[in-house]
Amino acid sequence: MEVLQLWSDRVVLEITERSEVGANFSWEGALERVKAMGFQIAVDDLGSGYAALNMLAELQPHFMKVDMSIVRNVDKDEHKRRLVDLLCSFAEATDSEVVAEGVETDEEAAALADAGVDLMQGYLYGEPSLTLTA
């Protein structure tokens, strides 16, 4: 870490909900080591796979990144809105933060903010870039 001039408390390791690991893999041991080094954990693409609740229980992430399939039209879809409300309540109860991915409209952003989403990313805020900025 020192050679790369990285501060572990500024690095978030994203584990996608769709990640496949071997049957003998233990998240617990690996995550204890990663967290002990000061890294933070995020579950990415939450809502796009099949084991979301199991992953949340095992990983105890610092961040929950809601997949854009749930974010899209959240301002017009009451079921999606209720799901985001529940995720925000769960995140608050577990000291996690909710990140909404793929936010494209002001209306989506407003609905997500009203639900309690902590952070948002998407084309509404800027296009993806290969350039690193601090």
Predicted ranges, named:
Residues 26-29:
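Signal-transducing alpha-helical linker
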Residues 14-23, 39-134:
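EAL-family c-di-GMP phosphodiesterase catalytic domain
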Residues 3-5, 34, 131-134:
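Alpha-helix C-terminal capping segments
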Residues 1-12, 37, 92-94:
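Helix C-cap/alpha-to-beta connector motif
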